[in-house]
């Protein structure tokens, strides 16, 4: 959530920056609510001052033995008015909060201007795409003989669900384990196992609600317990980041670096007809997530570090990729700045997103009330960052396609072989 003081000080300036990312702020609605708030607050303060004055007058009158009934009646009337005014002020504050909860973060000054993904800027590339001397297959054709089972996944759960069997299941597990080990052993993250079901207020904290409710899977408890709507996580960023909600951390507790391997559940609303073949866009997929909770002055250095951590995974797997900076019109709701890592997908002859690393600055922290004690000992909002390290299913896609062989086998990247008992190739079973 944006700091409301920013809007109060420079409403037109904030509206301009939001317009840069394709969001139209309802300036008139905010200005009207603010005017109503100021008027109500001023009236409340005037009544408070009048009541205080009358209370002193009552004391003086009693000291003189004078009749105070009329003045006390006026004080009582003011009290009733103040209660009504306070209720009105609470309602205005609630409406202001609801308005702000739908407003995205402000883009950092270094973010390139652009309306959509065509405005994204490439930062660097690593690796050279392999030149094949045979006809390249996509991951569906490579993976199906090795245990990729879309038919059973669809039979069990419908479209965009997949079952992995045998060698493919082992490779998928090896990828996740390799990522977690790298982040915990080399990058200083603490591994966390998180709940996959969270309460609505947790999603408000990280910005999925209220704006993106249609992208989530909702669940309800069975039995006789009071029914409360909860949600399946769309990323473990949600649960990891909210570990510091309603907290005041000591400065020496920062940075906090957390990582988790979890399934992610997304309804993919609005994605009809996109990436219908294969593993690229699924309702359920695994991801290894990185989250950092840091002091504000270090957050952009932390963002660069986090991107480097995601790059390390791709480099160890020998997968060609590129890093791009998302433009103002292509960033996610909570982000102030985002880098995407895109891996080379040979069958599509293009790069596809495999990681997104974002600095949300204080946007999520304000919604969660996550603070730390700064150098002056005063509570200040932390900055929160999140990044994929990596999307496991899409990494599986990249391995299958980049390491495929003419005979249908897949060479196992050297970094993964210790997780697969030293196996160097996934072979298609005879017959």
From Swiss-Prot:
Keyword annotations from UniProtKB, A to Z: Aminoacyl-tRNA synthetase, ATP-binding, Cytoplasm, Ligase, Nucleotide-binding, Protein biosynthesis
Function: Catalyzes the attachment of serine to tRNA(Ser). Is also able to aminoacylate tRNA(Sec) with serine, to form the misacylated tRNA L-seryl-tRNA(Sec), which will be further converted into selenocysteinyl-tRNA(Sec).
Positions contributing to ATP binding: 266-268, 353-356
Primary residence: cytoplasm
Family: Belongs to the class-II aminoacyl-tRNA synthetase family. Type-1 seryl-tRNA synthetase subfamily.
Protein name (record): Serine--tRNA ligase
HAMAP family: Ser_tRNA_synth_type1
GO function terms (MF aspect): ATP binding; serine-tRNA ligase activity
Residues where L-serine binds: 235-237, 289, 388
Pathway stated in the Swiss-Prot or TrEMBL entry: Aminoacyl-tRNA biosynthesis; selenocysteinyl-tRNA(Sec) biosynthesis; L-seryl-tRNA(Sec) from L-serine and tRNA(Sec): step 1/1
Lineage top rank: taxon: Bacteria
The gene coding this protein: serS
Cysteine pairs bridged by disulfides in the record: none
SUPFAM superfamilies assigned: Class II aaRS and biotin synthetases, tRNA-binding arm
